């Protein structure tokens, strides 16, 4: 399995050439560069954000702010899940994606521990985006 965190087609093409290496793309839909065996791609789409921020500059309403959008806002997406994934697994993945998007599931829900094994989130507790011990400050 090749899962890269670079917006490059090379890992997809290399997996395609190897023939038996499954790939998962990053930043844009990589299907054309390694159609099979491929699972999907994370797709970053900041277009609506950039349009809104540009309009705010133009109409004088711009202010500095942190942005932490994801699947629900459309800033991050999951591309088409290929036939390399069994239908039942694909359906489960799509249901999970949809629950992340509508907020009914939070990916960081306890119990979760930190890398050193110490407790981070208690059972049922969800991580906050900002503040002490938040997702934005995770390292």
What do these predicted ranges mean?
Residues 1-139:
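A residue-level marker of the well-folded mature domains of exported/periplasmic proteins
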